Amino acid sequence: MREIVTAVEMKELDHNTIQKAGISSPVLMERAALKTVEEIVQRLKNKEKEKILVVCGTGNNGGDGLAIARLLQLRGVRTWYYIAGKEEKMTAETAGQLKTAEYYQVPRVHNLDPDEYTTIVDAIFGVGLSRPVEGKYAELISTMNRASAYKVAVDIPSGIDSDTGFEKGIAFRADLTVTFAFRKRGLCFYPGRMYGGEIVVTDIGIYSIPGKKICMHHLEREDLKMLPERVPYGNKGTFGKVLLIAGSEGMCGAAYLSAAAALKSSAGMVRIQTVEANRIPLQTLLPEAMITCDFDEKKNQAMLDWCDVLVIGPGLGTGAQSRERAQWFLAKAAECKKTVILDADGLNLLSVHDNWKRFIGEHVILTPHIGEMSRLCGKEIGKIQDLSLIHISEPTRLALI
């Protein structure tokens, strides 16, 4: 699994590397530039015909850009740089990179015409952008976006909030984003994910802080190795038992799709507790699943004891009967710490309960989309991707997917 960081977490990791590991900011900047240049050069179709423009801001992202321009030029790729902003506002590191670029006579342009170039590199704003992009910066990014050139973003596309993925007025639309050390959360959420294009995470020598936990991760193909192998002498009873509390009248499809997915993902046995109206369709579509339409506590307890994983919600509905079913299983699962996956109407029913957090803990996995998360948090959808609002997983110690 790869860790995904916020701007604050990235700043802390960066600071730890500089202050405690003793690797200076200019060294990290040079490493970032080298990694970006490697990714760009790999994608050049004809180095002799390429014309690359690096658009640099005055912060450290701009310093990365100036170093990129210099290294490309030294590799024999025709490269120019453009400074967006006033030089007197440059950070010390970026001012140092400008001095180095001038020493190596990397050509600078003062009038921007992006259509002259085959590749445009965006190094205007980094992960610390905290205000809307307006005025000349908005015009600049708009001009860059209109160009037909191949577009590369340094660390994150300028104008994308690195925590939420939201567009701050306008954002650079990259074909490739080379991000450093860790993937930023804004490159996972839309529209930031879309604006990032192909996303490459590069190692520049910034690592996790020992004992410091980063709570968000994304899976990679190699993580499939964590799944246990199916032993050749096993049987359906040893490959996992799934109980679905799913499907209300007229909502058979969600129950069917969820149960079929459980079987396809190698569960040995699947049982569906649903309403009587869904029995025949489910038995016809999915004869390998077991169907139960009774709701009494003795049978419920037997099913709960039987299963390894409990899934509540697909097509369940939010009526009184559905609420009763969901709350009974939630309460009993909380007592025995049975693994529970809450999805769809399971989340909607949870959100209307006054004290819903008492039902959840480390045994619970929530799978909300943005609307369901809005109802759980009691916040407007437009504010949900402010990550300070969706950290319900932290105080309650549950898994959020």
Predicted feature residues:
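Small-residue (G/A/S/T)-rich helix-start motifs and N-terminal tracts that mark the onset
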Residues: M1-Y81, T91, L187-V340, A344, ...
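Cytosolic catalytic cores of cyclic-nucleotide second-messenger enzymes
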Residues: I401
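Short, conserved catalytic or adaptor-binding loops enriched in Gly and charged residues
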Residues: L98-E102, I170-A171, P191-M194, K357-R358
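Nucleotide and nucleotide-moiety/phosphate-recognizing core
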Residues: E38-A123, P132-V154, A333, K357
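Amphipathic alpha-helical segments in well-structured domains
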Residues: Q97-L98, Y137-A138, A174, A326, ...
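Small/polar-residue-rich loop-to-helix segments that shape phosphate-bearing ligand pockets
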Residues: L98, T118-F125, C307-L316
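Internal gly/pro-rich beta-alpha loop/helix module
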Residues: T118-T119, I124-K213
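A short, aliphatic-rich alpha-helical micro-motif
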Residues: P114-T118, A171, L304-D305, F359-I360
